[in-house]
Amino acid sequence: MKQKCVLIITDGIGYNKNSKFNAFEAAKKPSYEKLFKEVPNSLLKTSGLAVGLPEGQMGNSEVGHMCIGSGRIIYQNLVRINKAIKNKELEKNENLQKLLAKCKRVHIIGLYSDGGVHSMDTHFKAMLEICAKNGNEVFAHAITDGRDVSPKSGLNFIKDLKGFCENLGVHFATLCGRFYSMDRDKRWDRVKEYYECLLGKAYKVPNLLEYLQKSYDENITDEFIKATQNENYKGMREEDGIIFINFRNDRMKQLVEVLNSKDFKEFEREKVFENLLTMSVYDDKFKLPVLFEKEKIENTLAQVISKAGLSQLHTAETEKYAHVTFFFNGGKEELLENETRVLISSPKVKTYDEKPQMSAFEVCDAVKKGIEKGEDFIVVNFANGDMVGHTGDFNAAIKAVEAVDTCLGEIVECAKKHDYAFIITSDHGNCEAMQDEKGNLLTNHTTFDVFVFVQASGVSKIKANMGLSNIAASVLKILDLEIPKEMNEALF
């Protein structure tokens, strides 16, 4: 069977039997149509227990790529934190107790929704309660979502948080959309607005809930809420403690850098803070205490390929680069031997409905160059279905799928020419459900299955009831490498 192999991850494209407001179904996609006719294909599970999340919880890019790259189901931080709260282990956490003993005033920062991709509202509330009951003065800094949940669901979430804070005697200090506070593409002007808000130098209002409603009246949805503070909030002090409740790292790293790094030079800062505590490891370069340490994941797909002396290329545009490197490699940043990484810059637009093709064609070129060079294994992510799906723009999402389809056609042709096997799948769905039955925009991921296509010598059928954790072993089987005991079985 030995062949070189390309693994193509079409982010945010899933299978929805309902064709209404389904951008995948509505798109012109000759490459996909050809794949369905000519290549063995099936459906894979990408949500809930199949990827180590709670039952019914939608999958996400971090979890999906971890599952694909490690070849096993890893119980995610969301599940670990839920257990720690239920068993009252969180309040006994040594690093948390140290911070609460050292700092009288404590700030809780995080995305406040039940999306479960970056955070959970229940984790935010549990942390507020632990800190308040300990006798600390506590400040809540809520980041509104509108992306992993519906665009105006923030009103109910923030109403809930406001009441919770009042009952606990906690200060509801600031409000800001994730567009500003959770940027991951080095748009430092956005993060600066939030930094200044945390310091007490933003627009002041008497009631943050009323401000949110006023923003809706001006057609500003949750993701884009401008950084605003309660008029009674005076800002962070350098001796204060700061706790970040997001368990996913990629959209918190920049904010932590701004608040904590002594070497930061992107803009002038008035204060730098030392007493930070993060829910999980955001970046190995941050020498900060964490609540939930990383679980060690050994014998990942990339490690096995590297140890065998084979070459590999990992490529994506900025928005998904961390997913085909850090997450795919089991939460490790360091470059492996014979591993090449190619980062293609994402377009500098406010939201990707402005440019639905994003940088897909440049990413496609990088893959074709890798095939022509003779890389033994290539993994690539096309971000379009997910990133454009998140905008809620149905027509733009159709164009996004069509751009991916064009790229698939070119890569498949190139792979066949150079006798490469290929596997095509998605980490989760999104753009196949852009509105609900009532006509409300859906910008979040779905819990639908995703397609998988396998073109490799000797493969005529894919086993039933498979998931993302079965892909790594499939790649190793194609490369004719031994499958480690930690991995789940192959797809064929």
Swiss-Prot record:
Manner of cofactor binding, per the entry note: Binds 2 manganese ions per subunit.
Single biological process term from Gene Ontology: glucose catabolic process
Organism domain of life: Bacteria
Pathway it works in: Carbohydrate degradation; glycolysis; pyruvate from D-glyceraldehyde 3-phosphate: step 3/5
Sites where the protein binds Mn(2+) 1: 386, 390, 445
Substrates-to-products reaction catalysed: (2R)-2-phosphoglycerate = (2R)-3-phosphoglycerate
Keyword Cell membrane included in the entry's annotation: no
InterPro entries named among the record's database cross-references: Alkaline_phosphatase_core_sf, BPG-indep_PGM_N, Metalloenzyme, PGAM_B_sf, Pgm_bpd_ind
EC number: 5.4.2.12
Catalytic residues as annotated in Swiss-Prot or TrEMBL: 61
A GO term from the CC aspect: cytosol
GO molecular function: manganese ion binding; phosphoglycerate mutase activity
Known cofactor(s): Mn(2+)
Residues binding Mn(2+) 2: 11, 61, 427-428
Entry binding sites for substrate: 118, 147-148, 178, 184, 248-251, 320
Family annotation (HAMAP family): GpmI (MF_01038)
Similarity annotation: Belongs to the BPG-independent phosphoglycerate mutase family.
Subunit annotation: Monomer.
Role noted for this protein: Catalyzes the interconversion of 2-phosphoglycerate and 3-phosphoglycerate.
Protein name: 2,3-bisphosphoglycerate-independent phosphoglycerate mutase
Provenance organism: Campylobacter jejuni subsp. doylei (strain ATCC BAA-1458 / RM4099 / 269.97)
